[in-house]
Amino acid sequence: MCDQRHVSRTNTVLTDVAQDAAWLAHRYDPGHDAVHFQWAPRDVHRRTTFLTDAELPADSRKIVLRRADAVAAAPSEAPLHFIFHSAYCCSTLLARAFDREGHAMGLKEPVILNDIVGWRRRGAEPRNVAMVLDHALRLLGRPFGAGEAVVVKPSNVVNGLAAAMLGMRPQSRALLLYAPLETYLASIAKKGMWGRLWVRELLVGQLAEGLHPFGFDQKDYLGQTDLQVAAIGWLAQHALFAQLVARFGAERVRTLGSETLVAEPAAAMSALNDLFGLDMAANEVEAIANGPAFTRHSKLDEDFSAADRQAEHLSASAMHAEEIEKVTAWAAAVAASAGISMAPGAPLIR
């Protein structure tokens, strides 16, 4: 016979977790069709660069719920918007800027979306992937406060699902954030072996999702240098961004270069305030532009001005100048041959 006290207690836990955005929908387990939730209130988000197992507090509370149960008990979804990015382009900085009580909360690379990408690449049924993705957005879109929007910055590994996410949420808007190619290549080179390994891992994932319209075969990719692989991955993301702009239009999707974001933070935040419909007053936007999101290092939590950022870039560029120059010229030729613009349309700031 069913213990009614157990049922009541279980239902209470389910409701408490599903209703509270401080319970982060952290991981998806397709084997059990379950969502792993982890306690991550606003102050934890502020101390965490990315919402990964390595960075979230190891001793925080955790609970596993059936996906269907969690979604059924979730509250109405907040306005949900996205920052899709090419990596190494100040996206973490920008996600931090949207932690604004009363207006919005920024989520920095929630891993549940990466789990769905991995499941998809392992051959999951597309219909099931779409359903779980929709439910993941529902759980990530729980509001942290009354009237607040949620701005999700997925990992760039998730970019292949960007069109599906925007299609599922017709009211959502997106910023497509990128670094200029030379800056991106300098960032990869500065990371040494790990940066060069990362771009090859990105390439493997992009090829699995059919995101390379360049006509190269496996021998071509094997013959490319690490920075050529980095450049071709950057171009693949630019091609995808152009497709998103063409499909969803400038009313919903805008693009922004990281150098413009850093040089004009007030203008960028004002335009994003309008794009995402956050209704922040001019003085609030100005406070964000002059605040820690733009004046402290997003990963090291130390003072880091626009001048410091420029000096760091110039130092990395100088060490690899010849290779970066040659690879940039090669990438421009590849882009021209494939009909890909090096500067995507629908700029956020005109």
Residue ranges of predicted features:
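PAPS-dependent sulfotransferases, especially Golgi type II membrane carbohydrate sulfotransferases
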Residues: M1-A74, F216-Q228, L235-T255, V262-R350
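A polyampholytic, Gly/Pro-enriched intrinsically disordered region
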Residues: E125-H135, W194-E209, D301-Q310
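PAPS-dependent sulfotransferase catalytic domain
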Residues: R5-H6, N11-R252, G257-A282
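Short, functional N-terminal and low-complexity linear motifs
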Residues: I63-V64, R100-G106, R127-V132, V204-L211, ...
